[in-house]
Design a protein with these regions (language model features):
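Transmembrane-helix motifs of polytopic, lipid-linked glycan transferases
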Residues: 86-106, 145
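Hydrophobic, aromatic-rich transmembrane alpha-helices
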Residues: 2, 97, 269-296, 300-306
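Perimembrane helix-loop-helix junctions
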Residues: 2, 186-219, 286-287
Length: 485
């Protein structure tokens, strides 16, 4: 068994490295990751690498573990996304291996590895994967592992989870909480089922024991951050930026139910190759009398909780559905059950190899990022604009998110508010206005629209056209230079 698992883990690592090499814009095959969200993450990580304290010295809105990952990535490469690619590999490896272990509960080793590979390829080529490097991507292994643990426990007995497994689930939940806490819906569903089983077995004392074990696990990845921020006098900054502002100030106008349903249909369509199998698999599992009632209830509760978290907590973005991708593995499990009814095919090793090879071909040909693969940084807007800036010049992205010029120009923001985030925060807008009005940075970058005329201490130095989120060359970038006094 250990040898089998070791070989499976090695295969998952190789598959992850190649899939991401082909499909993620963080890989060495791409000149830069064009996604503004990913650039924000890496810019913050680069600032942290140089000693900046998150939330206190530089403002962003996601969880601290995500920025630590990017600080480590900046240690690998401070001038490219190669470090992010290096850290994407263990994340996807863990997700593939968790999927393998989940499938292995009900299938043979060959099918489990082949199905995990195909699931991984469908995930990294889906619309929700975007250009690579999202909070959802780094939460995927944690969510898939939690699903595998829950299935392993409740699939063998309708009793509360054993303490060590429950503690580990708590650790996974704590990891998610320190990356993006709005992705905790699946863990809420797991806790609801665990609480019900504990109450049934031993009443309130048993339920409190389960709650204590789970919360103790959550505290393991959370407490070090509390200590870190307290030691740096940034505890209030962390609470305000990550909790308060995201709850009360994030996003724009509330979407109507019609708008939400429209978004749901559109995003499901862009992720149909794993979303439809996930939905069919969940429906088949709910009706599968060969599984325990506890596991059917738990998986349904986890899926419902995550679905609610993705679609009804805050705004829905193109990448949001990646938080549901773990449930695509349930579709693979139910496919195996259906295949067993008509007889298992022979040549399992050959089929496994074929599935793995097909997954790599899929990652190469089906990724929507292929348009950028093989280009050089000098061929795209970020590289050309960076060439217009002298070495050592300071920069501020005045409007929109980070378009990648901080990275391409090998510079870092000097201001706490370095981009315009989707947070209705007056202090951020005022700080950006003040920096440009007082001509603090040498250069100012704006996207889509020209710099307002009131900021007359800058002159246009260069403009270029970059790619928008639909991979079209229609996003105009304007680079302004401070006028000589």
């Amino acid at each position: 068994m250990k040898k089998e698992r070791g070989l499976a883990l090695a295969a998952c690592a190789a598959l992850a490295a190649l899939m991401l090499l082909f499909a993620s814009q963080c890989s060495p095959l791409y000149p830069i990751n064009l996604w503004d969200d990913a650039n924000c993450l890496l810019t913050v990580g680069r600032v942290m690498r140089r000693g900046g304290v998150l939330y206190r010295d530089i403002y962003e809105q996601k969880g601290p573990l995500l920025y630590l990952i990017h600080a480590l990535a900046a240690c690998v490469s401070d001038t490219s996304f190669w470090g992010v690619y290096a850290l994407e590999i263990p994340a996807l490896t863990a997700a593939l291996y968790a999927a393998y272990r989940l499938l292995r509960l009900r299938t043979g080793a060959g099918f489990a590895l082949g199905a995990a590979a195909v699931w991984g390829a469908l995930t990294v080529t889906s619309g929700s994967f975007m250009r690579g490097d999202s909070a959802e991507e780094f939460c995927l292994p944690l969510l898939t592992a939690a699903l595998a643990l829950a299935y392993a426990e409740y699939g063998r007995r309708a009793r509360p989870m054993r303490a060590k497994r429950l503690l580990l689930c708590g650790v996974l939940a704590g990891g998610i909480a320190t990356i993006k806490y709005t992705l905790l819906g699946a863990m809420v569903g797991l806790c609801a089922v665990e609480g019900a089983l504990a109450l049934k077995e031993g009443g309130a004392p048993r339920a409190l024991k389960s709650a204590g074990v789970f919360l103790a696990g959550m505290a393991i990845p959370i407490l070090p951050w509390v200590i870190y921020f307290a030691a740096n006098g940034a505890l209030r900054d962390a609470y305000t930026a990550y909790i308060y502002n995201n709850v009360f100030l994030y996003g724009g106008e509330a979407a109507s139910w019609g708008q939400r349903l429209g978004e749901m249909a559109r995003y499901v369509q862009k992720n149909a190759l794993w979303a439809i199998p996930a939905a069919l698999g969940l429906a088949a599992l709910a009706a599968d009398r060969g599984e325990t009632a506890a596991v059917r209830l738990c998986v349904a509760a986890m899926a419902a909780g995550q679905f609610a978290a993705v679609f009804f907590v805050g705004r829905v973005w193109a990448y949001s559905l990646l938080g549901l991708a773990a449930f695509g593995v349930i579709g693979c499990m139910q496919l195996h059950r259906a295949l067993k009814k008509i007889g298992c095919p022979r040549g399992k090793k050959a089929l496994t190899a074929a599935a793995c090879a097909a997954s790599l071909l899929l990652a190469w040909f089906a990724t929507p990022n292929a348009f950028l693969r093989g280009q050089k940084i000098e061929q795209i807007a970020q590289g050309r604009l960076a060439a217009a800036m002298p070495e050592g010049a300071t920069l501020l992205q005045y409007s929109h998110l980070d378009d990648g010029l901080y990275l391409a120009a090998h510079t870092l923001p000097r201001e706490k508010y370095f981009v315009l985030l989707n947070v209705q925060l007056e202090a951020m807008r005022d700080a950006l206005d003040r920096a440009v009005r007082e001509a603090v940075p040498d250069y100012v970058l704006v996207s889509w629209r020209v710099l307002p005329a009131e900021f007359d201490r800058y002159e246009l130095a260069a403009s270029d056209v970059g790619y928008d989120d639909d991979n079209r060359l229609n996003k105009t970038l304007y680079l302004y230079r401070r006028k000589s006094e």
